Amino acid sequence: MADLLSSLKNLPNSSGVYQYFDKNRQLLYIGKAKNLKKRIKSYFSIRNNEITPNHRASLRIQMMVKQIAFLETILVENEQDALILENSLIKQLKPKYNILLRDDKTYPYIYMDFSTDFPIPLITRKILKQPGVKYFGPFTSGAKDILDSLYELLPLVQKKNCIKDKKACIFYQIERCKAPCENKITKEEYLKIAKECLEMIENKDRLIKELELKMERLSNNLRFEEALIYRDRIAKIQKIAPFTCMDLAKLYDLDIFAFYGASNKAVLVKMFMRGGKIISSAFEKIHSLNGFDTDEAMKQAIINHYQSHLPLMPEQILLNACSNETLKELQEFISHQYSKKIALSIPKKGDKLALIEIAMKNAQEIFSQEKTSNEDLILEEARSLFKLECMPYRVEIFDTSHHSSSQCVGGMVVYENNAFQKNSYRRYHLKGSDEYTQMSELLTRRALDFAKEPPPNLWVIDGGRAQLNIALEILKSSGSFVEVIAISKEKRDSKAYRSKGGAKDIIHTPSDTFKLLPSDKRLQWVQKLRDESHRYAINFHRSTKLKNMKQIALLKEKGIGEASVKKLLDYFGSFEAIEKASEQEKNAVLKKRI
């Protein structure tokens, strides 16, 4: 405590970010302040050189303060820089008492550029600087389905570079385009089609009606497979905005954020209103063993969403709850980011309060559906047995695969919300010559990506204690808090025992080794995770090997033998690099005379 007391007596009056650590140097919390001295001292009460938590703080904060043994600060120029740095560090380091919102993606917009002679609908996530661009969105899902439907229903120019070709293509022959490239339609006639396209984007009911008519025609002509494609597309477009029945008399452009939480679970709902209609919505489920802070959740949600410059900003941002201090901070952040004032408010009456109530009702409904399942009970039992500090709500599982140290690859699979999240899987080509260096490379590359993809609660490693220790060292050097377990086969005479029907799995934690019965649900849960990572890595290895065999066959056709292929691979690193190399470079490696 002497170090902490000394730090508290020498705090700067500058803007910056502060970090609290426990006695083991585990990161507890990251915060930011306009005045570090005032903010940090507000957590503590100091009497006779004895430090205690401020009794006015919440129980959650008091519990955290009791664990603080060290603090560090990072000074920045102003409060805006501190706000952005705080958000970045929380995502990268995942402190124990901070809430981590993972949904920080920029949603797509549909746009049409009317400064061109023949405008077409396209998708963007960025602001386009040319004049005459009209945006629609954001779309949390279904933007591509809308786009595909527009191109199939209307004779639009099908590709951006079509006009440059000056020659009609197959789309003209199948009556999907009017061939403006050959002047078969005037600009004025095409503009009518473009305006019809605008109407369908703005009025999804009309778009859906046209799709239903097309589906019916296909079905009547016994083209059932094509009709099914339209049926699925209609379903996706209908899901984009479940609140489209809500039309307000005033043409509001609003973004709406509602947060609802209790115990160790919470839900954040986002709704986007344009022209008085809700055009899309999204939600995120959040878990935390240490309770929730609405201010912190709202702050992170707003920064995540508006940190990238968006093509279409609302007139106003509505929140269901937030302190005046945080509201002011976020207002300044938005104004600074977009160089204009966009109001943030917590509505107390009228239409806008009704919108917040609808968002809250949906958040509560999603929350109520989060019933405790058998899987949740197994997670709790696994956390208790393996002495994990955090509930393993999000898990990353790693495995490597190779054949005689060739075609070395690694795979990472992700498990969250009681399901494998295949969109988050990652594949890696590895250079290591043995399983230890391969695993080290795999885990290091993942840790280096924590700033872009926040770390999970738990890593599961397919390997023994050596691989577990490698993971712990990498995480220690990264500064991020992630817990680790490993699973390996039982060994006899220093070899993994894999006899049919007799292979036993052992689970390793930093402090223990567990040999559980095959019927143990906790073991089966870890095995399920390991088996999926193994399947993923093996499949990637096989596809890599097949691709390499094809490349070798092509080189053999050019008169290059296997020994020469190995030399070229050792030098250039990949078949793609060999293809790009000149004959002179390849001959130099093979020491051939030209």
Swiss-Prot record:
Keyword set includes Protein transport: no
Predominant cellular place of this UniProt entry's protein: cytoplasm
Subcellular location: Cytoplasm
Domain UVR: 205-240
Pfam family, one: UvrC_RNaseH_dom
Example of a GO biological process term: nucleotide-excision repair
Signal peptide region: none
InterPro entries: GIY-YIG_endonuc (IPR000305), GIY-YIG_endonuc_sf (IPR035901), GIY-YIG_UvrC_Cho (IPR047296), RuvA_2-like (IPR010994), UVR_dom (IPR001943), UVR_dom_sf (IPR036876), UvrABC_protein_C (IPR050066), UvrC (IPR004791)
Keyword Cytoplasm: yes
Positions of the GIY-YIG domain: 13-99
One cellular-component annotation, GO: excinuclease repair complex
UniProtKB keywords: Cytoplasm, DNA damage, DNA excision, DNA repair, Excision nuclease, SOS response
One Gene Ontology term of the molecular function aspect: identical protein binding
SUPFAM superfamilies the UniProt entry points to: C-terminal UvrC-binding domain of UvrB, GIY-YIG endonuclease, RuvA domain 2-like
Transmembrane segments: none
Entry similarity comment: Belongs to the UvrC family.
Self-association state and partner proteins as the record states: Interacts with UvrB in an incision complex.
Function noted in UniProt: The UvrABC repair system catalyzes the recognition and processing of DNA lesions. UvrC both incises the 5' and 3' sides of the lesion. The N-terminal half is responsible for the 3' incision and the C-terminal half is responsible for the 5' incision.
Listed name of the protein: UvrABC system protein C
Provenance organism: Helicobacter pylori (strain ATCC 700392 / 26695)
